[in-house]
Amino acid sequence: MQTVNVDIAIVGAGGGGLRAAIAAAEANPNLKIALVSKVYPMRTHTVAAEGGAAAVIKEEDSYDKHFQDTVAGGDWLCEQDVVEYFVQHSPVEMTQLERWGCPWSRKADGDVNVRRFGGMKIERTWFAADKTGFHLLHTLFQTSIQYPQIQRFDEHFVLDILVDDGHARGMVAMNMMEGSLVQINANAVVIATGGGCRAFKFNTNGGIVTGDGLSMAYRHGVPLRDMEFVQYHPTGLPNTGILMTEGCRGEGGILVNKDGYRYLQDYGLGPETPIGKPQNKYMELGPRDKVSQAFWQEWKKGNTLKTAKGVDVVHLDLRHLGEKYLHERLPFICELASAYEGVNPVNEPIPVRPVVHYTMGGIEVDFNSETRIKGLFAVGECASSGLHGANRLGSNSLAELVVLGRVAGEYAAQRAVEAQSVNQSAVDAQAKDVVARLEALHKQEGNESWSEIRDEMGTVMEEGCGIYRDQASMQKAVDKIAELKERYKRIRVSDNSSVFNTDVLYTVELGYILDVAQSIANSAIERKESRGAHQRLDYTERDDVNYLKHTLAFYNENGAPRIEYSPVKITKSQPAKRVYGAEAEAQEAAAKAKEQANG
């Protein structure tokens, strides 16, 4: 096994990993940084983000407004000190990206253009047409290659992290191109591996997003926090799960049921707004959890349409925006709708349905993006920073990658310098154990198939932990995942080749994502309330008395995770009723009148 010695090792080369690498390199040019990625950086999942990144820019906007939208959107489960830091630093990072070359879309006068996004009461989403993730990632990637101290390990699959006496000390990875193994010794480790939505069958995530980093931290004793909160995006293509960005609705797209009726006005998101570029901040621009829940209600009422394959959908109608506007603002959406549904959005509505999109929960980290293991950091969707609470607002996540990616990189650089001497023999022994486990997997006898187990997992998670849940459905998921974890021990790996052995890769990935699925199901069944993306048919109300707290799932090698709780940090926004539409407008008008009266 090859050995490489660096100061910082970063797992994942998407937006969060790249930003952390750049920040660490700038913080201390003398540090050696390993950037380890399952794929070439421009193929990481950040590239799939379409809509934009949130940051205050308009004169009538403010940090406090962004803060209030985020906390209310997260149903008051956000860590409010993290939200305050985020809203203040996001404009700085957006400007930095521009200086590095990110081509933000512009208005005619040359100012940066911004669009509305769901749950935000003012336009603050910076965008680059509808390929924002691509342009953001390309900007970070081309910036990172300017730093010679960043050494890339592309197409390397991390098998485990190494920990000595409570301190992160590196990782073991498989070089997929050669089939060889490499031990990367480091004094700080940053996990930036994305979320765990592939625990569900119908999702927007790329094939590489299998909860790797979540599981690795989890198995080393770091709790996974708030895993029950899984976001359904309201508008995915029915046959593929490919996303129709929220920018479609931000630009004026509308959602209608089988009768052509804009049904969202019936679910606390009205009044109905004029068709065209929306002046109102609600209806189709309600938060994602509310809009997805409205679809479920329409489906129960029989108001959805059926595709040729029998899938229930509603229509996303963009026709009124016109061909020129669509091709200027949403060119990629037009391409995707045509390629995967045979629909030209200029002339026809797009069939859509909710699709699993984002895990609000993740690896528990503190204000500095550090876990309970010293020198182990996490950033992006794999991390539970506390920014998103029980429901993420669209466009906060791309901004999170760069704001908290910078934090993780800077503090990792600090930890790398401060690190005490390491018991290298103990670390080497751990690395050998990782190799032994991999060899044992090759020799494992049984007749189970990773593909069958993965399919069964996806189906039961959809049925048990979907948009709406109840005790019986979640118990079924809990029991089934426990059964699948036992069957996983009897998977037979039939491919003995060394180069790009996907049989081994998919088997190891399945072990990771089963951990994620179990943490989701077991966390969900213990939260006996409805909050944000966790909606129960048997506990329909939010319960701040008993459940205004974070769920912590601790790994148990021999069974179900141990569930504990931790408090929510509230700095200035006390829990209140979450309102949108006419009720929110009335509330805002009353507050404005009171402010004027107090003059």
Swiss-Prot record:
GO terms for cellular component: fumarate reductase complex; plasma membrane. It is a peripheral membrane protein. The active site is at H233, R249. Its cofactor is FAD. InterPro entries: FAD-dep_OxRdtase_2_FAD-bd (IPR003953), FAD/NAD-bd_sf (IPR036188), FRD_SDH_FAD_BS (IPR003952), Fum_R/Succ_DH_flav-like_C_sf (IPR037099), Fum_Rdtase/Succ_DH_flav-like_C (IPR015939), Fum_red_fp (IPR005884), SdhA/FrdA/AprA (IPR030664), Succ_DH/fumarate_Rdtase_cat_sf (IPR027477). It catalyses: a quinone + succinate = fumarate + a quinol; a menaquinone + succinate = a menaquinol + fumarate. GO terms for biological process: anaerobic respiration; electron transport chain; fermentation. PROSITE patterns: FRD_SDH_FAD_BINDING. Keywords: Cell inner membrane, Cell membrane, Electron transport, FAD, Flavoprotein, Membrane, Nucleotide-binding, Oxidoreductase, Transport. FAD binds at residues 12-16, 36-38, 44-52, 156-158, 212, 357-358, 381, 392-398. Binds 1 FAD covalently per subunit. Its EC number is 1.3.5.1. It comes from the Bacteria. GO terms for molecular function: electron transfer activity; flavin adenine dinucleotide binding; succinate dehydrogenase (quinone) activity; succinate dehydrogenase activity. It is found in: Cell inner membrane. The modification Tele-8alpha-FAD histidine is found at H45. Belongs to the FAD-dependent oxidoreductase 2 family. FRD/SDH subfamily. Part of an enzyme complex containing four subunits: a flavoprotein (FrdA), an iron-sulfur protein (FrdB), and two hydrophobic anchor proteins (FrdC and FrdD). This is Fumarate reductase flavoprotein subunit. The gene is frdA.
